[in-house]
Amino acid sequence: MHRAPVGRNAEGQYFMFCFEHVKEYNKGYNFFSGLSDSEVARYQKEAITGHRPTWTVGVNKNAKNGPTQSQTRSGSAGAQARMRDPFGFVSEARARSGRPEPRQRKLKTLEAKAFETLGLGASATTADIKAAYKDLVKKHHPDANGGDRGSEERFRAVIQAYQLLKQAGFC
C-alpha cells in the first residue's frame, strides 16, 4: 500500500493505493486545480519564504536615524552611541530607578591636548574634527606660508593631534 495526497485543502490526509493505482493517480493529480493564474503566482511567491510574513527592506525609520559607523566612538562610549531607544523604555527605567545617565568617555591627557590643538571641545563630532583638521592644515601648510618655521611646527602638531584622535576612535 502506498499513500497518495487527497488534495490541496486536505493536507496530511492520504488515499491508500497499490503501486499501480498510485502511479495512475499521481499522473492526474494537480495541486493547483481550481486556482486562477494570479492565485498560483501568489502561492509560488509566498513559497519562496515558506509562507511566512515578510517586510520590505529599508522601511524601518529607526534604521536611518542612527549614526553611521564612522561617526560612532570606540569602547563604552561607542556602545552607548550605537544603542537606540526609540520608545524611551530604557531612559524611563533609568529615571524611575534614580540611576544617572551614563557618563561621557573621560579623555586621556593626550586626547585632551589633541582636541585643544585643533581648537575643539571634547564633545566634537567626527565631522567637526575633520573640518577643523582640514582648515588648520590649509592654514599652516608650509607652501601657504612661505616656509615659515613657526607655522611648520604648528602644522606638525595639527597632523599629530588628528592622527592621535583617529587612533583613539574619535574620527
From Swiss-Prot:
InterPro entries tied to this protein: DjlA_DnaK_co-chaperone (IPR050817), DnaJ_domain (IPR001623), J_dom_sf (IPR036869)
Gene3D superfamilies: DnaJ domain (1.10.287.110)
Domain J, residue spans: 113-170
Source taxon at top rank: Bacteria
Record Pfam families: DnaJ
SMART domains: DnaJ (SM00271)
PANTHER family: CO-CHAPERONE PROTEIN DJLA
Designated name of the protein: Uncharacterized 19.0 kDa protein in cobS 5'region
Organism: Sinorhizobium sp
Lineage: Bacteria, Pseudomonadati, Pseudomonadota, Alphaproteobacteria, Hyphomicrobiales
